[in-house]
Amino acid sequence: MQKLPFAVLAVWCLLTAACVQRVLESVPAHNLSQEVPEGYRAIYREIDAEIDRQLPLIPLPWGQKKTDTAFGVELLAANSNRGETLLSEQVVHATALTLDRLKALGVQSVSLSLQYPVMTRNHPQTAEYHEFYRGVAADIRKRGLMIVAEMGSAFREPELSRLEVDYRGLKRDKFGAALREMAEAVIADIRPDFLTILSEPDTQTRNTGLSFSPAEFAATVRQVVKDLDHPGVKLGAGAGSWVSIDYFKALAAIPELDYIDFHIYPVQYGFASDRVLKAAEAARAKGKRVAIGEAWLYKVLGRELTRISQVEAFGRDAFSFWQPLDENFIQLVVNLARTIDAEFCSFFWMKYLYAYIDYTTETSRLSPGQLMTLSDSAAAENILKGKLTPTGERFRGLIQR
């Protein structure tokens, strides 16, 4: 997500006959629950079949033994897309409580997303953001958790970001210079174990209006990391598993990077299995480590991927009937992380480890934005109580070392 992922899918895959045929021929792997509403049954069947098809592709080659992958979640309470809301005493206390719950859940790492221009000198409240994130980092360290920081740009949609920022007229070199300034501040204030400079080039294009070919994206990342002083902080960059592998190859060629980061959302077309395995192979060939910086199941049909809005897709996540698919997706990604020996693996929508919303006549009429807000409130209530969903319980069992 740094974000909340995600972007325009590579057109080539949607036009590839084999890929389209594979999705169209998908059949449900399990009996469909009557709880799944009629309007969502096609999506459910397609995703269920895709996960069932891909699980055997990740054969757990380590012989069932645990790996050193640091499993964790996005600390949504401290995501800078929340804007000025972060700068309140209430959020500080809520973040500390959330960290207590995550520690009890068994996570080993916590991810922080920071969007340009937060923590740059030109931002009017940069001092307040510096203070907030220094405090959050200290709270994370007190609990013995690893810190992953990821930089990027803010979403344009008000449902996804409250940062008031206008990227019109932004040039690529200015964006790179600002990210360099942010990186220096993040290293000084947060001192993360891992710092992902930039990911999801297609998302950055949609947010900023800047184009990013593989070469252009790699050049921007190189602008940030060249001669960057980063004692004790590993540097990385990445992309979504749905884009061309050329992005991963271009990033892997950057000498200053320690790791390549993958984001996983849609499962169609092998995006949660063989595509990641191939990208990991390309990274390893250049001596890079690998990581899964964001992952959550994207509830869309394969044919919707190039046209559905993120707001609509993320609104679908809220309903409780998705729970079995979320659990199976988590299993798939955990298996994948261990197979590629990922440094860390972070699941984005941590709120669904604590609460879903039931699909009712009333909730079926809510807009995607309203569903997202309602699910936030439900999760906050259950985090306060320390109550997990079955998805949260499954997650806890899967990530145990």
Residue locations for each model-derived region?
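Mature N-terminal, pre-catalytic/accessory segment of carbohydrate-active enzymes
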Residues: 19-85, 105
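Active-site cleft segment of glycoside hydrolase catalytic domains centered on the general acid/base Glu
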Residues: 120-132, 158-255, 269-278, 285, ...
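Glycoside hydrolase catalytic-domain groove-lining segments
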Residues: 98, 150, 232-235, 243, ...
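Substrate-binding cleft of secreted/luminal carbohydrate-active enzymes
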Residues: 30-33, 37, 291-401
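Catalytic domains of carbohydrate-active enzymes, especially glycoside hydrolases
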Residues: 89-117, 192
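Hydrophobic faces of well-ordered beta-strands that scaffold small-molecule active sites
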Residues: 69-75, 110-112, 147-151, 193-197, ...
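Bacterial N-terminal signal peptides
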Residues: 7-16
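Active-site mouth loops of central-metabolism enzymes
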Residues: 76-94, 165-174, 239, 313-326
